[in-house]
Regions:
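Short, structured patches in soluble enzyme cores that scaffold and shape functional sites
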Residues: 104, 120-122, 142-146, 158
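Short, surface-exposed loop/helix-turn segments at secondary-structure junctions
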Residues: 54, 120-122, 171-186, 237-243
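Short, conserved beta-strand element in jelly-roll/cupin
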Residues: 126-149, 193, 225-228
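Short edge-strand/loop segments of extracellular domains
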Residues: 108, 157-164, 225-231
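Non-heme Fe(II)-dependent double-stranded beta-helix
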Residues: 1-16, 22-118, 123-124, 129, ...
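Double-stranded beta-helix
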Residues: 11, 147-207
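Non-heme Fe(II)/2-oxoglutarate
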Residues: 43, 48-55, 199, 206-280
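A short secondary-structure junction signal
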Residues: 114-120, 127-130, 150-159, 165-169, ...
């Protein structure tokens, strides 16, 4: 039986700005995501080696990784991002029009995984485009490990606590970490504890943070973000990407068209791009 998002989860999202979908990613897919995560962390470490640096943006070697928009360098990730599970989740919360806006690995290293301050995902858009008026988009926070306070899970503030439903706070950059901070008050939020294979969904205007990882294992998340329409800057330019996924409730994504491009990483197996042979 295919998964269906419970009506209670949609209601919770509409009321508070977030919801948890327990154990929705099957074991085989979970294993694939963990393998891909290991590849991209290694790739990022190699990139820092080549540049002779320990920090790239908000990525800190061994402590915290944010690795964005690399799915076209994988033969397998598109099957998850544009598959039946994500189609069900995204249409339940966004409606009949869905675009992939952003995807990234978020990994906290063992023992030394850094915290991440209170912020709104939309705050990172506003930081570069103060005049932005984009509607909230959907973050799907996919747990590749059991998420606990000890390994640095997220805490989320319900919309009504600080009035974040359709409001993007100004964010300030923190020296050293390069984090953008949107709130520094006393509210503690709701701690999201959930098992591997679960997905936390929240609005891009929801304030959230994560603690440090004090365990002896990595804490791994695959984060996929979707919008109901392309996100455009205040000057009319496209933000990140807008890969068509769902139109009028139907899947329109074509992996063949998306990955059959000379710019796609050679890591993609040739069979993904192979066209039918002509006989005659």
């Amino acid at each position: 039986m295919e998964y269906e998002v419970p009506a209670s989860s949609v209601e919770a999202y509409q009321e508070t700005g977030f919801a948890v979908l327990p154990a929705v990613i099957d074991d085989r897919t979970l294993g694939m995501l963990r393998e891909e995560c290991a590849y991209f962390v290694g790739y990022t470490d190699a990139g820092m080696d080549a540049q002779g640096v320990e920090v790239m943006g908000i990525t800190h070697r061994g402590k915290r990784y944010f690795i964005s928009n690399r799915y076209r360098s994988s033969a397998r990730l598109a099957d998850f991002l544009f598959g039946a599970l994500m189609a069900e989740i995204t249409t339940s919360f966004l409606g009949e029009s869905v675009f992939l806006f952003n995807e990234q690995w978020v990994v906290k290293g063992a023992d030394q995984g850094m915290k991440f301050a209170w912020h709104q995902d939309s705050g990172y858009v506003k930081a570069f485009d103060p005049a932005t008026t984009h509607p909230p988009y959907l973050t799907c926070w996919c747990a590749l490990d059991d998420m606990t306070e000890s390994n640095g899970t997220i805490s989320v503030l319900p919309h009504d606590v600080l009035g974040t439903r359709n409001h993007i706070f100004d964010h300030e950059r923190e020296q050293g970490s390069n984090d953008l901070i949107g709130y520094a008050g006393a509210e503690s939020g709701e701690v999201i504890t959930m098992g591997a294979g679960s997905v936390a969904v929240f609005s891009s205007t929801s304030l959230h943070r994560s603690g440090p990882n004090t365990t002896d294992q990595q804490r791994r998340v695959y984060l996929a973000q979707y919008s109901s329409s392309p996100l455009m800057s205040s000057t009319g330019e496209l933000w990140a990407q807008a890969v068509p996924f769902i139109t009028q409730g139907e899947v329109v994504y074509s992996k063949q068209d998306d990955l059959d491009d000379s710019a796609v990483s050679p890591r993609i197996r040739k069979t993904i791009r192979a066209k039918p042979k002509q006989h005659g």
